[in-house]
Structures are given as C-alpha cells and as structure tokens.
Amino acid sequence: MKYVVVILDGAAGWPLTELGGRTTLQSASTPHLDALAREGVVGLARTVPDGMEPSSSAACTSILGYSPVADYVGRGAIEAASLGIDLGPDEVALRLNTITLTDGVMSSYAAGHISTEESRAIISEIAAELDDDTFRLYPGVSYRHILVVTGHPELLDVGYTPPHDISGREAAPHLPTGAGAELLIDYMERARPLLERSAVNRSRAKSGSPLVTDVWTFWPGAAAGSLVPFAEKRGISSAVTSGVDLLNGLAVLFGMDRLDIPGVTGDSGNDYVAQANGAIAALSDHDLVIIHVESPDEEGHAGDMAAKIAAIEAIDRLIIPRVIIRADAGDVRVLAMPDHPTPILLKTHASESVPFLVWGPGIVGNGAEGFSEVEADSTGLVLDPGSRVMDLLLR
C-alpha cells in the first residue's frame, strides 16, 4: 500500500457573513475533495492539544503521527534543522521575520512577501554588521529567517508575539517581554539603521514595494532531544514536499526525505502541478508522501477571503485529481486535511479541531456529503489526540 497526505495549511476557518454563514472551505468549489469525502471516512481531528498555542509546528507534528507535547520541539529549532543548522547545547534558535512597520503599525509581517533573493541580500547586510559570538543570522526563504543566540537559554521563556498575530495593530506593545527580552529588542533596534541604508530598500522604494523597516524575533527553540524516526515508528519510508522551512525541518528531525521540487513555494505563486507530479513520482521509491501546501494559510493571515478560497480551489483542481489518477491503480490511500484553522476574521491561527478525510482501499464511508467543517462535525467522529489520523490512515 502507498499513502499520500495532503495538508491544506490553514484551510479551515469560521463562518463569514459575506459567505452566507459559510466558511471559506465550505464556499470553495472542491468537487474532488468532496468526492473523496463521500466515499471515505470523514471527521474532526484535535491537532492542537488544549492549552497549547495553535501553531503549525504543533498541528503538523500531530498529523505526522507524533505528540506535540511528548515530542515537542520549538519552532525555531525545527526551522533551523531545515536550514542544516546544528544547534549546540547553549544555543537558542528564533524565527526572524523581515517586516514593514508604518508609523509603528504592523502593516506587513512579511515585508510585502519579499522575494527570497531580496530578503537574503538584506539578511546578509545585517549579518555582516551584527554577527558576533552571541548572534548568528541565517537566511531562509522569503521573509522567514533564523537567528541563533549563544549563551542565553532564558530566551526560551521570553514572552513572544508572532508578527502575523498583530497585523494592522501597533507593534510596540507586543515586543518580547521578560528576562532576556532586552537582548533581542536591542538587536532589533541595531538592525533598523542598517535597513534604512540598505541597497535593497532603495530599489524597493523606486518600485513602490513595501520597505523592510524592521526585523522581528519570535518562536524560540533549543536543540531537539531524542526523536524516534518515522521509519522506525511506522515501518515505512516517507518523503515531504513543502515550500516552508517548518515542514522541511520536521522532515529532517523525523528522518523523512525532503523532495526538492522546482516551483514549490510557500505562497500563492506555488506551482501546484509540479508539486503534485513530483510527489506522485516519489511514490515509486517511498511508501508515504506528504504534500504540504502553505497558500491557504498565507491568505488567511492576510485576511483575503477571495484569495483563500482561490488557494483551496487550486489544491482541489491541480493536486487532488493527480493523486486520484495515481490511486486508480488500487494501492493508494489518501489523507487530506488542514493543520489548523486560519480564520479570515482573526488573521491568525485558531485552535478548533479540523476536518479530515481518509479515502482508499479498505476504507468504508461514514456518511459525509462533502469536505468541510460542518460535514466533518456531522459524522460524529472525533480523533483526539489528532495524531490518531496517521493510525487511521495506516491501519
């Protein structure tokens, strides 16, 4: 048996008045997901335990069949693993975003979704001036980077606010707080004049693109402890395709292969067809392949209802049919689900359970008429903890 997992990041949400009380997932045209739901098992999965931040790291850890509590790794450390950074015992890795503040307000947590080329140039400029025995800055993809701090374990307990949680709000009240926070705030302040004279920003000003006015640190993580590799835990080989460092970092930590597919990105510019075709090709020498698509989450953070619907529809139109065609051989099971909701009204993650569907040989339908939060709730099936979805897929 072969297995395909499709993660529609942040695709779940809340009912919207503009959509007649329907969610973006309900309103999206998803005939292929709906067809799988009618023939498969549909329910809700509790991917984020009570009391835990509804992060993609926790939720995706659950989907992969691990416990986000017992197998917890801080987000910064996960993304550091994706970049090939080996953390020492006295090092803390943090996500560092390039952002845009306008009159002190978080106008873009992603500096207008700056290109990787431009962002890396800016990060190189900052690193050249600020890297020392305490700080090391590593470029990532687009606006997402990693800052490694040596000798300050207290940073693990600082209070942080992700910048995407405060879009359109004054940033100053949400700066890091607690013991050690002043170290990070000082770093962020020292980066500002470097950004003001950046050659990249001069070019962006001419083109009318949002300037990178600041950097913002959050999501700390220390070196991961002993994690059981996926192959040892499940007895099968696996691979991951994703346009973001989070999933690629989880792949590294859990011993999964990473698929390098040209055109796969973490935004609406993702080449869905290339991602689907590359993942399906990987089934020839892997038992399980995970297709992670970030675009619905990005549009949820932007509060763009139409764009989020379009992203969900693109997955259904360009990825799911190709998976179904491969499944016609009769030896493929499919799991499709969001990791968490990213409601348009909230513009950040929520902690509610998310819909899932499992379809394929040996799976008997349980009465769902389509794939949505409402249909999943109507079946009465709830998997808590959410890691049980992997058990259901592989049983």
Predicted regions and their residues:
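Feature captures the catalytic ectodomains and active-site-proximal regions of enzymes
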Residues: 1-395
